[in-house]
């Protein structure tokens, strides 16, 4: 699902809100979450999951075109850990689908 599909879905279910209002809300939530992660904060949404930063150590990689070794620097990457309710909901719906 893309951001625009999410906006359309929410707007269709919340008829009192315009598409523009929903779009602004979704955009604002994403911006605030991104900024919180950039500031090194952990985000926890109970029943959904948590977002945190994980450290990736420097390593030697390979250029896929040339095969040459390339040094990749250490970095922090966003990590999502689904909450128990989300895991159970996804697992239950996948069991029904198979």
Swiss-Prot record:
SUPFAM superfamilies membership: IHF-like DNA-binding proteins
Coiled-coil intervals: none
Keyword Transmembrane helix: no
InterPro entries assigned to the protein according to its UniProt record, in alphabetical order: Hist_DNA-bd (IPR000119), Histone-like_DNA-bd_CS (IPR020816), IHF-like_DNA-bd_dom_sf (IPR010992), IHF_beta (IPR005685)
GO cellular component entries: chromosome; cytosol
Alphabetical keyword list: DNA recombination, DNA-binding, Transcription, Transcription regulation, Translation regulation
GO BP: any one term: DNA recombination
GO molecular function term, any single one: DNA binding
General function of this protein: This protein is one of the two subunits of integration host factor, a specific DNA-binding protein that functions in genetic recombination as well as in transcriptional and translational control.
Recorded family membership: Belongs to the bacterial histone-like protein family.
Oligomeric and partner information: Heterodimer of an alpha and a beta chain.
Protein name: Integration host factor subunit beta
Species annotation: Marinobacter nauticus (strain ATCC 700491 / DSM 11845 / VT8) (Marinobacter aquaeolei)
Designated gene of the protein: ihfB
């Amino acid at each position: 699902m893309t951001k625009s599909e999410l906006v359309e879905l929410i707007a269709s279910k919340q008829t009192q809100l315009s598409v523009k209002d929903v779009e602004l809300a979704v955009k604002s939530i994403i911006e605030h979450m991104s900024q919180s992660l950039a500031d090194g904060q952990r985000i926890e949404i109970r029943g959904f999951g948590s977002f945190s930063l994980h450290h990736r150590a420097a390593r030697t990689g390979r250029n896929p075109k040339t095969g040459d070794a390339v040094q990749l620097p250490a970095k922090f990457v966003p990590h999502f850990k689904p909450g128990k309710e989300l895991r159970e909901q996804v697992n239950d719906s996948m069991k029904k689908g198979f």
